[in-house]
Amino acid sequence: MSDQKYVLRYLPLFYEDLEEKIVYIAEELKNPDAANHLLDSVEQAIFERLPAAESFEPYHSLKERSYPYYRIYVKNFVIYYVVIDEGNDKVMEVRRFLYNRQDRDKVI
């Protein structure tokens, strides 16, 4: 296993996506416990992936991208992130949090 350390960074868009889903579950579906559990699961999944961010298959996209996207599945949702080489650091940049049935190619 590599000794590579990754710096974790989030895009504001990820926070917007996450907040939208959490608020919907808590307020519209009236299930704050499920919303809190989802939030905990998302946080745990990201931190578990951080030590080996590039050890998983990249997402194959029809679009040409500067950095390949990787996925983390959490319940009915998908977290999308990229790994950016910034000199001495490698950054795991978490970009989107989408419902797994959304049309991904239109939003990422």
Model region roles, listed by residue range:
Residues M1-S41:
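Arg/Lys-rich, positively charged N-terminal/basic patches that mediate binding to nucleic acids
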Residues S2, P58, D85-N88:
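Inter-domain helical "communication" segments and dimerization helices
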Residues K5, Y69, D89:
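Short coil/loop residues immediately preceding or within conserved phosphate-binding loops
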Residues I25, L29, A53-E54, R101:
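A general structural signal marking secondary-structure boundaries and capping sites
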Residues V42, R49-L50, Y81, V94:
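Conserved short aromatic-hydrophobic micro-motifs
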Residues Q44-Y73:
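A short, surface-exposed loop/turn module that caps and links secondary-structure elements
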Residues I72-V78, V82-I108:
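Enriched for short, Lys/Arg-rich terminal
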